[in-house]
C-alpha cells in the first residue's frame, strides 16, 4: 500500500540523516512530495522531519518540488458554501452560539463537537458525509448517510452516542434543516446544541478546516454512495494520525486517547 511505502521511506531517511545539514536531494524531494500528496501541510512535514517550513516553501516557489501551491491544504480563500437549504424559519432555530459557555469556547475538555455535512453533486446524489469533530482534540468521526434529512442525521448520531465511550457535552451546528431534530437528543441525553449565525462557517472553524482537507480524499463531485466503509475508515485513520501544530505537534488520536484515559481514572 502507498502509505506503507511512504512510512518505510520516512524511516530510512530519518536513520540516514543523523544531524546532517539539510540539503534537498532526490530522496528528501520524494518524501516531501509524498506527504504533500497525502494532504500534509508544509508545517507538518517540517516538524516531522526537522526541516524549516520556510525551506519547503522556498523549494516549492523555486520549482524544485513539482507541486502546485494552489493544491496545499490551507491555500487560498475558502468559498462560502451555497446555503440554499437554509430556510427563513431556521434563523430562530434553537439555542444561539452566543449562549455557548466559556468552557466550550476555550476547548478545555473533550466532548464538545462541531457537526457538518459534505454533499455530493447537487441534483445527482443524495448521499452525504456527516462529520463530527471534537473541539479540543480535533479528532474526527464521519458517517456516510443515504440522505441529508434530520431523521437520518439523528440516526447516525444515536449510533455515535452508542459507541463512543467518552463524554458528549454539546453540539455546535449551522442552521441547516438536517440539524433541526437535535432537540430530541437534548431531551434524551442532555446534550446541548448551539446554532451558529447564518453564513458564518468560521464559527465552526475546526470543522470547516477538516472539510477542506477531506476534499483531498473526496474531491468535489464525489458520489458518496460509492465510497466503501473500509475506505472511509482508512481516510479517518490518516486524518486523525496527522501531527498538528495547534496540538503542539501531537496527533488528534494521541490527544483523544490521553483525555479518555484521564476520564477513566
Task: Describe the residue ranges of each PLM region.
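Short, basic alpha-helical/linker "hinge" immediately adjacent to a nucleic-acid-recognition surface
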Residues: 1-35, 48
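Extended, domain-scale alpha-helical bundle/helix-rich regions
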Residues: 31-59, 64
Amino acid at each position: 500500500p502507498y502509505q506503507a511505502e511512504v512510512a518505510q521511506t520516512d524511516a530510512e531517511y530519518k536513520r540516514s540523516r543523523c544531524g546532517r545539514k539539510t540539503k534537498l536531494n532526490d530522496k528528501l524531494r520524494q518524501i516531501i512530495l509524498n506527504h504533500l500528496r497525502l494532504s500534509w501541510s508544509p508545517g507538518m512535514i517540517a516538524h516531522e522531519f526537522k526541516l524549516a517550513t520556510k525551506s519547503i516553501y522556498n523549494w516549492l516557489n523555486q520549482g524544485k518540488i513539482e507541486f502546485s501551491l494552489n493544491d496545499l491544504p490551507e491555500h487560498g480563500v475558502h468559498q462560502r458554501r451555497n446555503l440554499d437549504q437554509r430556510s427563513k424559519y431556521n434563523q430562530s432555530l434553537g439555542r444561539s452560539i452566543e449562549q455557548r459557555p466559556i468552557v466550550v469556547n476555550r476547548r478545555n475538555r473533550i466532548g464538545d463537537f462541531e457537526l457538518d455535512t459534505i454533499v455530493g453533486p447537487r441534483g445527482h446524489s443524495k448521499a452525504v458525509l456527516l462529520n463530527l469533530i471534537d473541539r479540543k482534540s480535533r479528532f474526527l468521526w464521519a458517517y456516510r448517510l443515504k440522505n441529508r434529512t434530520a431523521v437520518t442525521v439523528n440516526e447516525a448520531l444515536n449510533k455515535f452516542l452508542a459507541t463512543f465511550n467518552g463524554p458528549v457535552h454539546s453540539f455546535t451546528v449551522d442552521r441547516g434543516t438536517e440539524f433541526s431534530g437535535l432537540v430530541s437528543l437534548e431531551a434524551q441525553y442532555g446534550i446541548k446544541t448551539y446554532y451558529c449565525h447564518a453564513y458564518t462557517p468560521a464559527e465552526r472553524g475546526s470543522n470547516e478546516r477538516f472539510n477542506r482537507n477531506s476534499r483531498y480524499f473526496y474531491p468535489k463531485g464525489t458520489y458518496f454512495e460509492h465510497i466503501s466503509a473500509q475506505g472511509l475508515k482508512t481516510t479517518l485513520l490518516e486524518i486523525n494520525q496527522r501531527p498538528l501544530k495547534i496540538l503542539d505537534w501531537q496527533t488528534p488520536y494521541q490527544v483523544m486517547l490521553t483525555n479518555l484515559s484521564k476520564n477513566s481514572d
